[in-house]
Structure formats: structure tokens, C-alpha cells
Amino acid sequence: MTDLTPREIVSELDRFIIGQKDAKRAVAVALRNRWRRKQLADDLRDEVYPKNILMIGPTGVGKTEISRRLAKLARAPFIKVEATKFTEVGYVGRDVEQIIRDLADAAIVQTRDYMRDEVRARAHKAAEDRVITAIAGEDAREGTREMFRKKLKSGELDDTVIELEVADGANPMPMFEIPGQPGGNMGMMNLGDLFGKAFAGRTTRKKLRVADSYEILIGEEADKLLDDELVNKTALEAVEQNGIVFLDEIDKVCARSDARGADVSREGVQRDLLPLIEGTTVSTKYGPIKTDHILFIASGAFHIAKPSDLLPELQGRLPIRVELRALTEEDFVRILTETDNALTLQYTALMGTENVAVTFTPDGIAALAHIAAEVNQSVENIGARRLYTVMERVFEELSFTAPDRSGEAVTVDAGFVDTNLGELTRSTDLSRYVL
């Protein structure tokens, strides 16, 4: 669980997302409240429930990106799901309880990784011993083993090929579908999971370079040092106390006020979400999970439906509402220059692999931002995603000819942008279909 302050969380999000101060502050406070709750006495801790968040804003303004970056910061079990993937209980498809089962799966993997890091030093020593045994043989004297250990540490043996017995990761048992539960993996039953330990311990012989064998062996030795029961217990506790679920596209399961007739994937899904968000117990293959203290962050563009079209009970369970504003031309300039993962940096690096040096001038960046904002206004506002389209069109010719232009330097200025995009931007009909 992260112990970053709200200010630190916001400044971390600022590295990747421009603007949207309210949304960043809301998720930062929600994340910090998880830490605050952990500091409370046990009896009070159970009474403090998370305040779930509803993010409202047009497409392409950073809702999903906030969730993605939050997942990396949280150091807590986190899952992002689209509400449109689920159907009402009783119909073919995934029901919403699968969200918690997927969250538990993610938590097990995350917890195992953290615990592996804790025993890595001991696992490294055991892996080293196995490599030395493979090179020097079982009966080698201590002096010989020490000689090989020194060579191993100096890197002299990195290219030596050795034969090792490593765990066989292939699943010996097939998966089969449970009748009446078709579709996806949700109706699949893995016999390997059922019979678990009966098939554990299967090994296979592999020839590997010493340098390549280390990670495999360290992973194996770390797993031997871990207690599976403790991993499961710790992971389930982390899900119950610190889990975060990001529900994207929540507006797509709104039944519009003027719509008529039943819709399997809409109102029923909302009804099924109610107990999940309020607090219920979901059974998973690792054990039951209480969802009372899991934080839910829902988001949607609400382009056609309105937040008031959600079931009143669901609105009540998402008490904190945050509006994200549409992006302006100035925002696009900042997105292209200030973020750590700016498209300008990405294209410069991509062309650099072909030995073509690309540089962007301020007027070139301003031209890109202006075109993106203009097309968003005249055609359809898809936010920052429009920059992908514009950049791809500008670089189309260069991307194709880059291998033949090795060693050249290309400057992306207003003239370069106009040459590659001018005709399209002047014709609204063309930009409607191409940009």
C-alpha cells in the first residue's frame, strides 16, 4: 500500500496527464484515505467505508489514463474493467462477481511477486548452487566449487551451456467448459487447479546458457521458499482492505430515459453492481472475499445518457462526482511537450531506430495542436486521441521511407506539418473521413 501524500500523488499524475485537477485530487484523496484508515484502531477501521467516485467527462480527456497511472502508484490490488463486458445474472456472459474474482487473481500474482522479492537473496544463493552443481558435478569438492563460484560471479561462465532439471510449466490437464456457462474463460474449469499438488513437481530437462538460467532458477527457488497458504491469505486480505476497481464505460449500461423494452446488458448489470459496491461476499477459488472496503471508481463519457439515468441507488453509492473538462489547443501543446510519454518523444525515438534524427520546433508543435483542436471542433471531439491520428498522418511518408533515409536529420516545423496535412485540413469533407 502506497504512503504517498495527496500532493505527491497529484504531482506523479501530472507527469502523464495534463489538466483535470479535480479528478486527480479526488483519486489522490481516496488513495490517501486508504492509508489513513489503516492507521485507525480496529473497531473504528471497520466503520470507515471508502467514498466511491464517479468521473464524468468527454472521451479522450484522461479518465482511463488516470486509472492506469493510479494502478502503478497504488501498490494495491487493482483491476480495470469495462462495464459493457458484463450481463445480468442468468443470461449468457460474465456476471459482475467475476470482477472480484479477477481482482483476486491479480492480487495473488502481485503478492507472490512482492514476497519473491523479499526472499530473493536466499533464492539467488540456492540458484547459484544449482548452477555450480550442473557445471562441476554432484561430487565436486568444496575447493572446486569455490573456484567455479568465483568464475560465475566474474561472468566468465555466462556463455557456458548447462543442462538443468527445471519445473515443467505446461498444464498436464485440459480445461473444459462447464455446461450452461459458455463464453470467455469464465465457464472454464481447470483440472490442474482442482488436483493442484498431485501434478506439482513435474520437471523437464533443458539446455540453457548460464546467464539465461539465472532468472528461471531464482524464480523456482523463491517459490520453494514461499508458503502458498500465506500468499493466498495475504492476497485476499489486500483485496478486502486495499482493493481498487476501476469501472470504465459505466454510461454504456445506462437505460436511457426515453428507451423502451428490456435490455439484458444494461439495467440488470446496474442492479447486480449495487450489492457489489455496497458490500457483499463473493466466493472465489481462493476463499470468500468481502467487498465492503473495496474502492470503486466509475467513469463514463455520458455522451448520450446522463448521470441521472443511472439507477438512483447506484448514484447514491457513487457519492463523489468529478467532472473532467474537454481539452483545448493549449492543452494539446502541453501534452506534446510536457508529459513524460509525449508523442513527440515517442516518434523521435522510433525514427532514431532507423538512424533518422527528428526534431520538433515550437511552431511545428503549435501547428499539430491547432489542427487537432480544429478537427475536434468541426468533426467529432475525441480529445487527446485526435493527436494520434494527426501525428500518424504527418509521419506517414517519413515512417515509410525512413529505412532509405538513414543518417538524415528531419525538422518537424509548421511547413512540414502543412506539407503533409495541409490539403486534408482545408477540406472539411476529407478531414471528416481521414482525420
UniProtKB/Swiss-Prot annotation:
- Which GO terms fall under biological process for this protein? protein unfolding; proteolysis involved in protein catabolic process
Domain of life, source organism = Bacteria
GO CC, one annotated term: HslUV protease complex
SUPFAM superfamilies in the cross-refs: P-loop containing nucleoside triphosphate hydrolases (SSF52540)
User: Which key words tag this protein in UniProt?
Assistant: ATP-binding, Chaperone, Cytoplasm, Nucleotide-binding
A GO MF label: peptidase activity
Compartments annotated for it: namely:
Cytoplasm
Q: Which residues bind ATP?
A: 18, 60-65, 248, 313, 385
Subunit composition and interactions: A double ring-shaped homohexamer of HslV is capped on each side by a ring-shaped HslU homohexamer. The assembly of the HslU/HslV complex is dependent on binding of ATP.
What function does this protein fulfil?
ATPase subunit of a proteasome-like degradation complex; this subunit has chaperone activity. The binding of ATP and its subsequent hydrolysis by HslU are essential for unfolding of protein substrates subsequently hydrolyzed by HslV. HslU recognizes the N-terminal part of its protein substrates and unfolds these before they are guided to HslV for hydrolysis.
What family does the database annotate? Answer: Belongs to the ClpX chaperone family. HslU subfamily.
What is the name of the protein in this document? ATP-dependent protease ATPase subunit HslU
Provenance organism: Ruegeria pomeroyi (strain ATCC 700808 / DSM 15171 / DSS-3)
Q: Which gene encodes it?
A: hslU
